[in-house]
Amino acid sequence: MRSSLLFCFSVWIAVFSHGQDPSVQMENTGAIRIMQLRRDGPTRVRYPDALPSLLELMNERSLANFDPDPLFIESLADERLFEHPVLYVNCDELPNFDFSSEENEALRRYMTLGGFVYLDAGIKASFLGTDLGHSYAAWEERAEVRQWFEQLFPDQPFTPLPRNHEIFRTFYKGLPGNEYLRLEEDQKRLPDTVLTFVEQEKWPQGTYSMVGIKVNDRLACVASPICAMGWGRDEFGAWIPPISFRVRESAEDFDETLQVASFAGQTYEVTREDGLKDEIYLVPGNRPLWVKEPTGRWRIFKYYSGEEISNYAHSFYARLGMNVFLYALLN
């Protein structure tokens, strides 16, 4: 529980699900407004419709009452920071991570007094380059984020959130079902190879790669690979933009073949959930080609696209985003 609050808010939330019981109820006294940091105004915006779409979706699927228009602030020294419970930051939108001492002190106080900070794209594997995807095995905050928060809480490093953390089941539990895919009856569902990889490795139990910082024994900040790409909807309610899946696949003789394959690109190491390292091999242009895993197994990256895959990914990211924001309000 929060020991002290500089702002006051309350919300009434009931679980919107298929066959699940409402889990949490609180008094509803008005719309909750989520803040978003935009240091360069609209010039570096990524996924401009993402957060408003997610807030509208939370209003549709729960009894929560969110203002669908985020409150944009250009500086962490903005006095309005202390009037709202959650600050959202898309780290890919920041021109740099050079904050003034006044801004850092304001953010430190905000988190100490009960504020919650969500750093989207706060995890970014170095091999991705300009790729909008992510690695399911990235469990470290990006270096700029780590250096920034070391100034605020030098004794509180980011630590990975375990798969059983409540943030992954605050509102939704597990992976999306076919009812969220919006497919016609004659359209196929996810290919079995893709679904198996997603269920067992990419997003096990509907979880994700996240790290967080605790302040006064309360989770006050989380960082994740980019999620906003999965929140946007157009005026007709269709998901935008299209999302493809990158999965790892193996086949007979892969281990022997890839060890001797000709290769002219770069390699990067990525930290896995178990702390071991995957070695990623890239073709020119920073597109992952294959991976050498610490077990000695080699697998190739294969890319799948299509409406059923895109809808599934959007459903997952939207459910995850809802879990994060509702967790922030309830803890």
Descriptions of predicted regions:
Residues 4-15:
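Bacterial N-terminal signal peptides
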Residues 20-86, 90-94, 228, 246-331:
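Aromatic-Pro/Gly-enriched surface loop or interdomain linker
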Residues 45, 127-140:
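Short, flexible/disordered intra-domain loops and linkers
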Residues 145-222, 227, 254-259:
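Acidic, glycine-rich loop-and-strand cores that form catalytic or ligand-binding grooves
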Residues 86-133:
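Short alpha-beta junction capping motif
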Residues 25-29, 79-83, 102-103, 110-112, ...:
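Extracellular/periplasmic catalytic domains that process cell-envelope and extracellular macromolecules
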Residues 21-25, 75-77, 204-221, 235-236, ...:
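Short, surface-exposed beta-strand/loop micro-motifs that present aromatic residues
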Residues 33-36, 85-90, 116-120, 157-161, ...:
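Structural recognition of the beta-strand scaffold that forms the well-ordered cores
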